[in-house]
Regions:
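Conserved structural position within tetratricopeptide repeats
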Residues: 24-25, 59
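Canonical tetratricopeptide repeat
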Residues: 2, 36, 70-73
Length: 91
């Protein structure tokens, strides 16, 4: 994931997404790749994939300290994408 973070900081979002997706594929119960995927997709202005990744992050790690912040990001992205915001309860 460190290589993915490097690519993200350099603005090479496609390479970063490849690395984070690979980490998520091999360790699907690890939360961090899903969060980083969401952030990278968001930087790439890919709202649908960002939302999907953030939701997976919350599914894998529902007790995350930043859960409320991530839920707010999801709602904001859904609003911008013209979707009905999710009705997820706050843990």
């Amino acid at each position: 994931m460190e290589i993915g973070t490097f690519y993200m900081k350099k603005g090479n979002y496609d390479a970063a997404i490849d690395r984070f997706a690979e980490a998520a594929r091999y360790q699907p119960t690890l939360a961090r790749p899903w969060l980083l995927l969401g952030e990278t997709y968001e930087k790439k202005h890919d709202k649908a994939h960002a939302i999907e990744s953030y939701k997976k992050y919350l599914e894998v790690f529902p007790g995350a300290e930043d859960a409320a912040k991530v839920q707010k990001r999801i709602a904001t992205l859904e609003e911008k994408a013209g979707q009905q915001p999710s009705k997820r309860p706050t843990p």
